[in-house]
Amino acid sequence: LYQAGLTYHCTCTRGDIRAALAAPQEGAPVIGPDGPVYPGTCRGKGHLAGAVRLDMGRAMARLGQVAFAESGTRLGTHRFDAAQLIENVGDVVLARRDIGTSYHIAVAVDDAAQGITEVTRGEDLFEATAIHVVLQRLLGLPTPAYHHHRLIRDDQGKRLAKRDDARALAKYRAEGATPADIRRMVGL
């Protein structure tokens, strides 16, 4: 991607990005799959260090449009063009100083290396899937079929996720919840 001129180095911190997005302008900052959409502050500046970002405009100029098949919550074929991805995703980080590769590039390459043909994931990763498809296409990797499922939530509507310190299903069972109670709680 670097040799194709599709990446650049970015020295912005998260604070720099928040400050740039807080500057007076029309409309509010767009929140993408990785948080606030990066405004492109370092694009074209020729920095030689910092995070490596994908220049989404150049990437999409090369690809035109990308699409993936979805069999889950948003059934159908989903197509994304340059304008949509630039506005809603921006120039995503592919590598940082502290981490050699991002989740996005890792999952695209790893799925291909393992011969994955179907991916099932939570609907909270739907927007990130477009990034993965862009990377798959740019790298000449196969694009699997995707199935995004509803998130499993507790009786208060909070999603059950380790990163949110959610209670494990085993804890509900230990407190006397039956399998039927748990199915009802998560909407099955």
Language-model features, listed with the residues they occupy:
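Residue-level detector of family-conserved "landmark" positions at structurally sensitive sites
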Residues: 11-12, 146, 182
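Contiguous mid-protein beta-loop-alpha structural module that forms a pocket-lining wall or clamp
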Residues: 3-16, 22
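Extended, charge-rich low-complexity interaction segments
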Residues: 174-188
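A generic alpha-helix structural signal
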Residues: 2, 129-133, 183-186
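Active-site cores that bind ATP or allylic diphosphates and position pyrophosphate for catalysis
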Residues: 15-161, 168-173
